[in-house]
């Protein structure tokens, strides 16, 4: 299972690429919130991945709010848990923050990754440089393949 949040499509793309590579299903966080589903059960032997954007070097509010209400149950003992943060400029302490926040609900990540893509927060960054954006997208895709 890969839990993801994507406001612009980047994280959905990353989650889909990982899911395709390891034959996992993706679960949009927005749907869990909309359905008020705050309990997740991960069957024994299934991986648990999380793909999130970096917001101001931290986690999105929708995820932090969800984790305050969530119960995540890993059945059995055979799980590989990982977290992927996408970012455009700097990912700051998002990986250690993810480890801390998910630790509060009993999840310890085996691996933490950061993949750089185009920074798409338009009030702060100039997005019209097609060549720069193309290079950033290629970089993000290459980093996603490594993950």
PLM feature segments, named:
Residues 1-2, 6-14, 18-34, 38-147:
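FMN-binding flavodoxin-like domain, especially the glycine-rich phosphate-binding loop
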